[in-house]
UniProtKB/Swiss-Prot annotation:
Homopentamer. Interacts with membrane protein M in the budding compartment of the host cell, which is located between endoplasmic reticulum and the Golgi complex. Interacts with Nucleoprotein. Interacts with host IRF3; this interaction inhibits type I IFN production. Plays a central role in virus morphogenesis and assembly. Acts as a viroporin and self-assembles in host membranes forming pentameric protein-lipid pores that allow ion transport. Also plays a role in the induction of apoptosis. Counteracts the production of type I interferon by interacting with host IRF3 component and preventing its translocation to the host nucleus. Residues 36-76 are intravirion. GO terms for biological process: disruption of cellular anatomical structure in another organism; symbiont-mediated suppression of host cytoplasmic pattern recognition receptor signaling pathway via inhibition of IRF3 activity; viral budding from Golgi membrane. This is Envelope small membrane protein. Keywords: Apoptosis, Host endoplasmic reticulum, Host Golgi apparatus, Host membrane, Host-virus interaction, Inhibition of host innate immune response by virus, Inhibition of host IRF3 by virus, Inhibition of host RLR pathway by virus, Membrane, Transmembrane, Transmembrane helix, Viral immunoevasion. Belongs to the alphacoronaviruses E protein family. Its main location: host cell. PROSITE patterns: COV_E (PS51926). The chain crosses the membrane at residues 15-35.
Amino acid sequence: MLQLVNDNGLVVNVILWLFVLFFLLIISITFVQLVNLCFTCHRLCNSAVYTPIGRLYRVYKSYMRIDPLPSTVIDV
């Protein structure tokens, strides 16, 4: 067998470790992008859904508020 360099598998080991590091880098970037997407969706829902519903609930609460009875009605 013709052998150019006697490195005892060092080149193959380095190439495999580079593949592992590249894979971990891709996974990390994907996770960071997923977290960024979650924050973007939360900001969108906050401005498009949560805030208007909160305003509608405050209007409903003020509309449904019942004033207490005057004290003169309670006197017997």
